[in-house]
């Protein structure tokens, strides 16, 4: 019997897969426990529509991420901070600070978890990588200047 999985089933497949299961297993276990539904023509059509909608949504998100990466490319974030001895900062500049500065300077709201940068403790020019989407990332310059 062909069934559409509603949840991940260890021995059969992942949610949304169209699989062949024995009649007894499907009727007595999968369908009553709402792990699967019978693969009727209508259900298969609905499944295909859902998969197509998900594919379009992912494509749209990828395009938006690429636009954001393009707009961030070549941007420079400037920090003016108080300096102690030997050009060292009081404290440090982290990905959270970079995220806040991006919001302040360019009005771009980027989560701090998406910013990969070493902890900055001295003046100079550094590079921070921003991973916008799994396949899309860009780099921005971080300038730390004396106040």
From Swiss-Prot:
InterPro entries: Ribosomal_bL9 (IPR000244), Ribosomal_bL9/RNase_H1_N (IPR009027), Ribosomal_bL9_bac/chp (IPR020594), Ribosomal_bL9_C (IPR020069), Ribosomal_bL9_C_sf (IPR036791), Ribosomal_bL9_N (IPR020070), Ribosomal_bL9_N_sf (IPR036935). It comes from the Bacteria. GO terms for cellular component: ribonucleoprotein complex; ribosome. PROSITE patterns: RIBOSOMAL_L9. GO terms for biological process: translation. Gene3D superfamilies: Ribosomal protein L9, C-terminal domain, Ribosomal protein L9, N-terminal domain. Keywords: Ribonucleoprotein, Ribosomal protein, RNA-binding, rRNA-binding. One of its GO terms (molecular function) is structural constituent of ribosome. Belongs to the bacterial ribosomal protein bL9 family. Binds to the 23S rRNA. This is Large ribosomal subunit protein bL9. It comes from Clostridium botulinum (strain Langeland / NCTC 10281 / Type F). The gene is rplI.
